[in-house]
Amino acid sequence: MKKQVRKKDEFQFNKERYYLMYKNIEKQTKLNLKDQVDYQPGQVVSKTLVQNEYVSMTIFSFDKGEEISTHAAGGDAMVTVLEGKGRFTVGGEVFFLEAGDTLIMPKDIPHAVYGEEQFKMQLVVSY
């Protein structure tokens, strides 16, 4: 089997694309993701940390009673609750998640998120 060799320029382009993908966050610093977004009365607040053609990572805060209405994503979505408690409806099934819990929401399946109380979550979508 013949080994595939990359051209130097192609490698440099890919290397830069992968290493320069974080934004809106301090690098080389110890931090806690839940501290990266604040609660706002009556709002859902988001802060995108990564966005490219392969993956997105966003931190959200939900005030109690706030929601993201039913929608579907173009990739598999993984949510991890960082603080508080939220309700997730995925394909008609309801899940209650609290700090430390993670849920995978499959691509193209309708889902919604509701703040049972104030809560924060990390969302990672892979395309």
What are these model-predicted stretches?
Residues 82-83, 98-99, 117:
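A cytosolic small-molecule/anion-sensing beta-strand core signal
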Residues 50-52, 63, 73, 81, ...:
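A short, compositionally biased micro-patch
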Residues 92-107:
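Short acidic-glycine-tyrosine-enriched beta hairpin
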Residues 42-43, 56-73:
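Conserved short histidine dyad/triad with adjacent acidic residue
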Residues 2-54, 89:
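A short, N-terminal "cap"/entry segment at the start of jelly-roll beta-barrel domains
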Residues 107-127:
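Ligand-binding loop in jelly-roll beta-barrel domains
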Residues 75-87, 91:
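Glycine- and acidic-residue-biased ligand/ion/polar-headgroup-sensing regions
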